Design a protein with these regions (language model features):
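Aromatic (often tryptophan-rich) hydrophobic motifs at membrane interfaces
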Residues: 1-89
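In a subset of proteins, long, contiguous C-terminal domains/tails are tracked
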Residues: 79, 84-116
Length: 116
């Protein structure tokens, strides 16, 4: 693999924020995911003077690396209208659980939130 690309991460830059969205690899290496998706993104933000890095939704491993759990939104296209009501009910119920999980996950950050 020497000198060959074995992984890539896709980032988008908008305003003062870098957004990490997708990644893939051809071979597995310890910590490659973190290097490609987080550490290189952080380094780019510092070099480019960006004030925010949004590494994407999900992934409890992000909390250990100091990424605060934040709410995000998604859109769903439901082809068969018969599922619309069931999906809407589930989404409404899930909302409370997601908010509770966000608060619980924030307690796992390697630093304290709020003013000193």
């Amino acid at each position: 693999c020497a000198g060959e690309a074995v992984a890539a991460a896709l980032f988008f830059e908008g305003g003062d924020t870098l957004y990490g969205r997708y990644w893939g690899c051809l071979a597995e290496f310890d910590y490659l995911h973190f290097e490609a998706c987080y550490y290189r993104g952080i380094e780019y933000c510092i070099d480019a003077g960006l004030s925010r890095f949004d590494p994407g939704a999900q992934g409890e491993h992000k909390i250990q690396r100091g990424f605060e759990p934040v709410l995000t939104y998604s859109n769903h296209w439901i082809v068969d209208e018969r599922f619309s009501d069931a999906v809407a009910r589930f989404a409404a119920q899930e909302c409370d659980h997601v908010r509770a999980y966000q608060q619980e996950a924030a307690t796992l950050l390697p630093f304290k939130l709020g003013s000193p």
